[in-house]
From Swiss-Prot, chain A:
It comes from Chelativorans sp. (strain BNC1). CDD domains: Trp-synth_B. Signal peptide: none annotated. This is Tryptophan synthase beta chain. The keyword Cell division does not apply. One of its GO terms (molecular function) is tryptophan synthase activity.
């Protein structure tokens, strides 16, 4: 594949067809096409509407608790002996992760479109919980599709969703994980086209989802920019974030894409290693293909059949990635690297002991990369990492891996 | 474009004043050889057009029956290459029944569009139905397929309103596949009078034949739909006929080709009576 010519700006995508270079697009069944066009129309109106922005900002401030702090991790920095490490504390948001930023934006959009029923897919349950939360807040019924395997391994989040009034539908088709949940959500949407809004949890899917989810998450990077300028008087040298579908990473990265001095690293789930099939590193070990409405890097076999991924973190357990990340990889603007399960587990424990913060397993992957890089950087350099979620949901999984009883 | 087997078939059926019976089956379900025997049995039992399903790991527009059939085929080692080979093998003794390959884009994209079209043409493929390629993505496969002389058959759905229909029909050829409801394959058939209205609406925009599918399972439904449509598509019922003769271990308990043929003979009688019944009423 030819490398695209470096654009003047990395922040202008997607184009009118929803493409980021060759990635993105609208690969959906005809039944859904009119719905996606309708969504695009409403999104284009909403993003330029000051009242929409104001309502979202108001909810962000008083419901989510924005801005989230930018925290200087003093003890970790000292321990690593290199670059100063800052955390963007998205784990302090209501519902415990960055997911709520997107859910609030999209439910306002759903309301604007007159939709009366919300559907969502979830892997670890973080997006499911955030969707159920905003659906409760706005009084809309919510159905969450979740792979049967995930329902079993994420019992506390399933209960949370049910408490919030959502109906959790276990998906047994395929292999019962996130990609099957997404297939099932699409099947629901294609059936209930009149009243239903599909609240996608990451910056992927058919256009305009990758764009609108990114824009709702970009509040992370915008705040970071102001906060780091206030704290340090300059921009950071490096941004680090975990990528599953890639919404927390694109949210942090996007406002900085044209700041040439800021390096960016997206951290994928290397699982048990890239040699076999037990990983979710679609950008490092996959190839471009078409799934779930967009062209992007996927884990697939030589016949174009999609593989199941593996990660210790259910939130990274998806064989694809948002299309903008695929484009940023090929453009060379962002570097993507894998982190293994065991490295993430070690990072999880280190942060817990050093800073008194229990991170989710997803940002623990980003942290493991920070642990590798910070010592090699100068003490005058700055890394900002997106601490995208808290680890309460993961204590059972971690206990199992550490062979401890809860 | 020169006339294709599909065009010739509809001209012939128009003269006979009857709708086409379009039968879908999953290539490679439960294995290559059995599946090829099913394919060969279809026209003998009265099928006019064969839709050859290409299995995909993530069939987002299909119901449980076709999902399961696809997984069985993949487990049995089916690949796009083998599906093309199956068509080629079928063509050795049948040169008139149109074959339309139906499935999702990714396996074709990975195979390579140009290579696929060359092979498809050499294998006697007449048309393509690719569920996840709406007109907005025509440059991907539709335009190259038309250039290669292969029909690109588009799905029109209840959500395709009059404003959008011209766009959907623009590069469509062969026939238009009207999906009788919003939903996945194999759901319940809607009110047949609604279907007739929808067919009339589409015919107001195109001279192409309109075939109706999604939800047709029995001969009487085929007869009712066939009164208004130029063709009746049956898929899930055929896939189920295969599943019904598979034991829990995946071994066949009866001949799947014969099970499918029995069903198709009934459906063929249904479509042949469609216009006669309609005229008598």
């Amino acid at each position: 594949m030819n490398k695209p010519v470096e654009p003047n700006s990395f922040r202008t995508g997607p184009d009118e067809q929803g493409m980021f270079g060759i990635f993105g697009g609208r690969f959906v069944a005809e039944t859904l096409m009119p719905l996606i066009l309708e969504l695009e129309e409403h999104w284009n109106a909403a993003k330029n509407d000051p009242a929409f922005k104001a309502e979202l900002q108001q909810l962000g401030a008083h419901y989510t608790g924005r801005p989230s702090p930018l925290y200087f991790a003093e003890r970790l920095t000292e321990h690593l002996g290199g670059a100063k490490v800052y955390f963007k504390r998205e784990e302090l948001n209501h519902t415990g992760s960055h997911k709520v930023n997107n859910c609030l934006g999209q439910i306002l959009l759903a309301k604007r479109m007159g939709k009366t029923r919300i559907i969502a897919e979830t892997g670890a349950g973080q997006h499911g919980v955030a969707s159920a939360t905003v659906a409760a807040r706005f009084g809309l019924p919510c159905v969450v599709y979740m792979g049967a395997t995930d329902v079993e391994r994420q019992a506390p989040n399933v209960f949370r969703m049910r408490l919030l009034g959502a109906e959790v539908k276990p998906v047994t088709s395929g292999h019962g994980t996130l990609k099957d949940a997404m297939n099932e959500a699409l099947r629901d949407w294609v059936t209930n086209v009149e009243d239903t809004y599909y609240l996608i949890g990451t910056a992927a899917g058919p256009h305009p989802y990758p764009e609108l989810v990114r824009d709702f998450q970009s509040v992370i990077g915008q705040e970071t920019k102001e906060q780091i300028l206030a704290a340090e008087g300059r921009l950071p040298d490096m941004l680090v974030a975990a990528v599953g579908g890639g919404s927390n990473a694109i949210g942090l990265f996007h406002p900085f894409l044209d700041d040439k001095g800021v390096a960016m690293v997206g951290v994928e789930a290397g699982g048990k290693g890239l040699e076999g099939d037990e990983h979710c590193a679609s950008l490092t070990a996959g190839s471009p293909g078409v799934l779930h409405g967009n062209r992007t890097y996927l884990l697939q076999d030589s016949d174009g059949q999609i593989k199941e991924g593996h990660s210790i973190s259910a939130g990274l357990d998806y064989p694809g990635i948002g299309p903008e990340h695929s484009w940023l990889k090929e453009a060379g603007r962002v570097e993507y690297v894998p982190i293994m399960d065991h490295e993430a587990l070690e990072a999880f424990q280190l942060l817990t002991r050093l800073e008194g913060i229990i991170p989710a397993l997803e940002p623990s992957h980003a942290l493991a990369e920070v642990i590798k890089r910070a010592p090699k950087m100068g003490k005058d350099q700055i890394i900002v990492m997106n601490l995208s979620g808290r680890g309460d949901k993961d204590i059972f999984a971690v206990a199992k891996h550490l062979k401890m009883d809860v | 474009m020169t006339t294709t087997r599909i065009d010739r078939l509809f001209t012939k059926l128009k003269a006979e004043n009857r709708p086409a019976l379009v039968t879908y089956f999953m290539g490679g379900d439960p294995d290559y050889e059995t599946s090829l025997s099913i394919m060969k049995a279809l026209p003998v039992a009265g099928s006019d057009i064969i839709e050859l399903g290409m299995p995909f790991s993530d069939p987002m527009a299909d119901g449980p029956a076709i999902q399961a059939a696809g997984l069985r085929a993949l487990k049995g080692g089916q690949t796009l290459d083998k599906t093309l080979r199956m068509a080629k093998s079928f063509r050795q003794d049948n040169d008139h029944t149109p074959i339309v390959m139906m499935g999702y884009y990714n396996p074709i994209y990975i195979y390579g569009v140009d290579r696929f079209l060359t092979e498809a043409r050499a294998s006697g493929i007449d048309g393509l139905i690719i569920v996840d390629l709406p007109p907005e993505m025509d440059e991907e496969l539709c335009v190259p397929a038309l250039r290669a002389g292969i029909n690109f058959i588009r799905l029109a759905t209840p959500t395709t309103d009059d404003k959008r229909l011209p766009k959907v029909l623009e590069n469509t050829s062969g026939f238009v596949y009207y999906v009788s409801m919003t939903g996945i394959t194999g759901s319940a058939l809607p009110d047949t009078s609604k279907v007739a209205g929808a067919v009339a609406r589409i015919k107001g925009h195109t001279k192409l034949p309109v075939c109706v599918g999604f939800g047709v399972k029995t001969a009487s439904q085929a007869r009712a739909i066939g009164a208004a449509a130029d063709g009746v598509v049956v898929g899930t019922a055929i896939v189920n006929a295969v599943a019904n003769v598979l034991g829990p271990d995946g071994k066949t308990t009866a001949d799947p080709a014969e099970a499918v043929a029995t069903l198709v003979r009934g459906l063929a009688d249904g479509v042949r009576e469609a216009r006669i019944t309609a005229a008598a009423e």
